[in-house]
A protein has these predicted regions:
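Substrate-binding groove/exosite segments of carbohydrate-active enzymes
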Residues: 2-102, 171-173
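The feature captures the catalytic groove of carbohydrate-active enzymes
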Residues: 75-96, 102-119, 126-177
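Beta-strand segments within the central parallel beta-sheet cores of soluble alpha/beta enzyme folds
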Residues: 62-66, 115-122
Length: 177
């Protein structure tokens, strides 16, 4: 049933729900925007807590995460991008995924989140510690380093002729904050 638009909160709830996307019954995603964007990994994880947990829909959060985790695992194992979740190969996607799981923990409690996501977070950490990501490296000083001179790897991903408008390389502050 549609949420009645009788309050500001209900209007926000309605707006959030308009981005839910289920191409198959067993899948759950968030669209990055209408009509031009599809499902983009960075946007998915950044917006997931606000579009689910803040409107008291933890089940939707868990369904979306249940869809996203196999896609990320597949990328970590094969290096191949997902068909539905675009830009899953971007290095900060993994960091935003962990951030989203932290928001789940804040809302639903550490024990519940630990039960659902602890092992997967460990897989991501191992992936970086073993230097498996093609575009980001964990350096000896404990910071994450990217080489983005010829490839847009951050949220500042505008390109002209396939090259970044703002090339960002090194210890990107938002990756290491």
């Amino acid at each position: 049933a549609r949420t009645p638009r009788i309050s500001f909160y209900n209007c926000l709830k309605n707006s959030a729900q308009q981005f839910y996307f289920r191409p198959k019954e067993e899948d759950a995603y968030l669209l990055a925007g209408y009509p031009w964007f599809k499902v983009r990994a960075r946007d998915l994880f950044i917006s997931m807590p606000g579009c689910t947990l803040s409107i008291e829909d933890p089940v939707r959060f868990e369904k979306i995460m249940h869809t996203a985790i196999p896609a990320i695992r597949s990328f970590m194992q094969t290096g191949k991008a997902d068909e539905e979740i675009r830009e899953i190969e971007n290095p900060d996607v993994f960091l935003w995924d962990i951030w989203a799981m932290q928001q789940h923990s804040r809302k639903m409690g550490v024990e519940k989140s630990k039960e659902l996501y602890f092992n997967f977070i460990g897989e991501i950490i191992t992936y970086f510690r073993e230097q498996k990501h093609p575009d980001m490296k964990l350096m000896e000083n404990g910071l994450l380093f990217v080489e983005g001179r010829n490839k847009a790897l951050t949220w500042m991903n505008s390109t002209v002729d396939g090259k970044p408008v703002v090339s960002r390389s090194g210890y990107i502050v938002e990756f290491n904050a």
